[in-house]
């Protein structure tokens, strides 16, 4: 009987021998490769934390002790050890989340997937424990690049200020950037420095020497400096010790005995401690280890033996952008690129290979990236900052005060905009068009197809006196959606027949094919429809108000929050122009969306062609005085969804 099937909770690990734990680690890696190859998910990071997670759950008593995960995609092993072994629907509707989830287990504390936040959480929980006089331990696991985020260092600065507040910080270093521990002396120093006796010895020595006339303080400083210099020569601990944090490591993150020993010492220390673990991303899976650039950080469905994708769906939005950036780079030497530790996921890998001196990876530091972009623009180049839409939220103040206020020509390219689906609430890029509406001078484009991505990216990088934004969806890009005409700066995708048109349907971005389907359904009901794509949704095109005035109803459809989005902006523009036409906006309701496929999420929130057509039909019927019970029921359903 496999050991893994006998693990129903963390305490089941206590009775296992070292040999059995080693076997369990192998079983977990086999399970992860098999399960994630069928569903997709974050494979490489989880293969690297198997032994670390086993050790954490043997040393600490979750859920009484709080085990917190930064960049929560490292939590698959944690899920397996806390009673969640059904990975058959990982990241699918009704299945396990790809991140920690309070709704799944009492062992999950924070539902995070945005990096560098866990130390702030740990600081707060440790403070609460102290106030409430609880003896619970707090363990924060941070790594996979998250220490490149400024928030992590802000938290460390606060954590270090409380020497008597217990908090264990595990640095999961899978980048192989630190040297291994050198010999027994380093091990001895690491052990000695996290014991109460050693701390008392240092305190007494300092007290005695400082009372000694003339030579006391200089002698203590000399001895302490020599000790520190020796330890810093042996192990890369200086940056943590300079903050006042005790340091254990580096520890082999795949040596269970060493891990348990280090974590046990840290647990007993009684103050903030760094435990530095060296792990190997993708460990035990040869295709991941051979992928030096990414180590299978996140994968779709793959062949487990080879790691090759099972199928490809043609060109995707990201690759279209990446290819066009490469062309722009060849044409314009002043175009540079910025990424926040996402070079390949945002499509800048080809640009980086061709122009290594014109691409800047700022780490998981979107705030710094935006300010650095402002400086680049001030210096005469045009930066293109490619980032997931959900992560731009972190840099809003910098976009507003450093880029827009200074009228800097910076282009932000927002990948994964709108409903992304399987990555859940924290990864849906559903707020960008709302929060960016308030930024003076900013121009925002929402391309509907690959041709428009190329065209609007080129339009954006010409602007040198204001920030520009180009947003697009996740996944396959689909066929081109041709325009049949032009009104102002807007593309007409469907012109009405003869007579007064009923509905002006404003289609935003990738929802254009669905909006054309809505128009077809309305036409079958005898409702004539004009479909327009604004292309640039901020500012609202000046031709919008006079065009709306020639219709009976205006309908906006966007892959963004209904609150403060494009629909709200169009409504305000019509009011300002004195155009009194009913407007119905369709978008994402103001709530967090559970993980499911994009199609399932859109269906659940009523953002489908049949749903929209039914409601617009009811609205037109009310205008005609043909309001009926069916129309009322439609409104009630929509109200419930909101």
From Swiss-Prot:
Keywords, sorted A to Z: Isoprene biosynthesis, Magnesium, Metal-binding, Thiamine biosynthesis, Thiamine pyrophosphate, Transferase
Pathway the protein acts in: Metabolic intermediate biosynthesis; 1-deoxy-D-xylulose 5-phosphate biosynthesis; 1-deoxy-D-xylulose 5-phosphate from D-glyceraldehyde 3-phosphate and pyruvate: step 1/1
Pfam families in the record: DXP_synthase_N (PF13292), Transket_pyr (PF02779), Transketolase_C (PF02780)
Chain sites annotated for binding Mg(2+): 144, 174
Annotated InterPro entries: Dxylulose-5-P_synthase, THDP-binding, Transketo_C/PFOR_II, Transketolase-like_Pyr-bd, Transketolase_BS, Transketolase_C, Transketolase_CS
Cofactor annotation comment: Binds 1 Mg(2+) ion per subunit.
Listed GO biological process terms: 1-deoxy-D-xylulose 5-phosphate biosynthetic process; isopentenyl diphosphate biosynthetic process, methylerythritol 4-phosphate pathway; terpenoid biosynthetic process; thiamine biosynthetic process
Keyword Magnesium among UniProt keywords: yes
Subunit relationships: Homodimer.
Biological role stated in the UniProt entry: Catalyzes the acyloin condensation reaction between C atoms 2 and 3 of pyruvate and glyceraldehyde 3-phosphate to yield 1-deoxy-D-xylulose-5-phosphate (DXP).
Protein name in UniProt: 1-deoxy-D-xylulose-5-phosphate synthase 2
